[in-house]
Amino acid sequence: MNVIKISPRGYCYGVVDAMVIAKNAALDKNLPRPIYILGMIVHNKHVTDAFEEDGIYTLDGPNRLDILKQVESGTVIFTAHGVSPEVRQIAEEKGLVAIDATCPDVTKTHELISEKTADGYDIIYIGKKGHPEPEGAVGVAPDKVHLVESEADIEALDLTSDKLLITNQTTMSQWDVHDLMELIKEKYPHVEYHQEICLATQVRQEAVSEQAGQADLTIVVGDPKSNNSNRLAQVSMEIAGTQAYRIGDLSELKLEWLQGVNTVAITAGASTPTPITKEVIRFLENYEPDDESTWKIERSVPLSKILPRVKTKK
């Protein structure tokens, strides 16, 4: 089968940094145990499973504050998605050692919100409800940050401030953000805007929009909780006009999707381990619709190959 390997794809620097921080924590014998991650360090189950083998445990819950209630001692790692100031304060009050793996792009958004709300602004924040990144951003100034995800949310806004600013979750579709920003500007013509789609997200979306149209089908390798992976599939369908499916790994690929397909494009979310994506690429490159010996779908990447290598400090 013809395979278009969309580039760039896969890991971004924020994800790699977060994983290296967590990996170094696992290697640091001086850190108090147990070591917990407040939510998924990045949105990929293969990564969290690999960290568990290294003795770092991922805690889950509806929000970071509730997750933190599960921890009474040891070390906590804040994920790449960021946390609210309240979470940081409670971790400190509990006497926990806190390690911050927040993506620098997310930190920049938090700083923008803090600066503008201190100057009297209300913030209209475009993001996905229930996702940890908006949770942390709203938590910077809960009374001043208004989360919107849809046109209905914008219609429901009732803001009277002369000082309004729009910003957004870093992993949203840039086209969705643009459309929602335009609706907000229609309602509040005096609003200022500061688009915060991170560069890694933007170039990956643009690559799909430009390259997926050459294929009959797009496969996005990424975790179901990965917003940027889901947005890549959306971009393929809505911008490039090519049917797309998101899979967590090779085991989720369906042979019926390949019927009548001559060329498939493949990309991966920013938190998808490279070996997982390479395994899917190898299968598709070897797949022949008339050769049953190429049809076997079997994931074989061991957890030991998932995490980046970190040099041990001497």
Swiss-Prot record:
Metabolic or biological pathway, per its Swiss-Prot or TrEMBL entry: Isoprenoid biosynthesis; dimethylallyl diphosphate biosynthesis; dimethylallyl diphosphate from (2E)-4-hydroxy-3-methylbutenyl diphosphate: step 1/1; Isoprenoid biosynthesis; isopentenyl diphosphate biosynthesis via DXP pathway; isopentenyl diphosphate from 1-deoxy-D-xylulose 5-phosphate: step 6/6
Entry EC number(s): 1.17.7.4
Reaction catalysis annotation: isopentenyl diphosphate + 2 oxidized [2Fe-2S]-[ferredoxin] + H2O = (2E)-4-hydroxy-3-methylbut-2-enyl diphosphate + 2 reduced [2Fe-2S]-[ferredoxin] + 2 H(+); dimethylallyl diphosphate + 2 oxidized [2Fe-2S]-[ferredoxin] + H2O = (2E)-4-hydroxy-3-methylbut-2-enyl diphosphate + 2 reduced [2Fe-2S]-[ferredoxin] + 2 H(+)
UniProt binding sites for isopentenyl diphosphate: H43, H81, H131, S226, N228, S271
Pfam families registered for this protein in UniProt: LYTB (PF02401)
UniProt binding sites for dimethylallyl diphosphate: H43, H81, H131, S226, N228, S271
Gene Ontology molecular-function annotations: 4 iron, 4 sulfur cluster binding; 4-hydroxy-3-methylbut-2-enyl diphosphate reductase activity; metal ion binding
Cofactor(s) demanded: [4Fe-4S] cluster
Function text: Catalyzes the conversion of 1-hydroxy-2-methyl-2-(E)-butenyl 4-diphosphate (HMBPP) into a mixture of isopentenyl diphosphate (IPP) and dimethylallyl diphosphate (DMAPP). Acts in the terminal step of the DOXP/MEP pathway for isoprenoid precursor biosynthesis.
Family: Belongs to the IspH family.
Protein name (record): 4-hydroxy-3-methylbut-2-enyl diphosphate reductase
Gene that this polypeptide is encoded by: ispH
